A protein has these predicted regions:
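Feature captures hydrophobic
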Residues: 1-133
Length: 133
């Protein structure tokens, strides 16, 4: 089973791609879990001082408290580990397209847009078009 990336490296990735995180409202959270038997999740959390990263228990989809959750199979998690210091979003986008990473939107599209997720979602390969319904 692949380990989650180091929280400091995950925070560094957010800093390198700061333009994707700047529009996010304080309190916005993105989680990463291994697909098989997740006990912990790695979080990006937006706060007043910017984006923090930390490992937290994963209590399940319904109560994990994130806006978006990325679930990676072992091979994709290995690629994420390799890419965390480089072009992480290209790796995530490729694995989402190939099905190795499943992206769960745990908020309605309108809520994600209102919280500033549009650029981040576009970087992951999701384009929202049209009026929010």
């Amino acid at each position: 089973m692949s380990a989650l990336p180091d929280a400091a490296a995950w925070r560094g990735a957010a800093a390198r791609f700061g333009g994707l995180f700047e529009p996010l409202d304080a309190g916005a959270r993105v989680g990463l879990i291994p697909r098989a038997n997740p006990a912990s999740m790695l979080l990006w959390e937006v706060g007043a001082q910017g984006v923090a990263a930390r490992v937290a228990p994963f209590p399940g989809f319904a109560s994990c408290g994130v806006d978006m959750l990325l679930s990676a199979d072992p091979e994709s998690m290995d690629r994420i580990l390799d890419a965390v210091g480089g072009d992480l979003f290209a790796a995530l986008r490729a694995d989402i397209r190939q099905g190795g990473v499943v992206c769960y939107m745990l908020r309605r599209r309108c809520d994600l847009e209102a919280r500033g997720f549009e650029d981040l979602l576009e970087a992951l390969g999701f384009a929202f078009m049209g009026a929010c319904r």
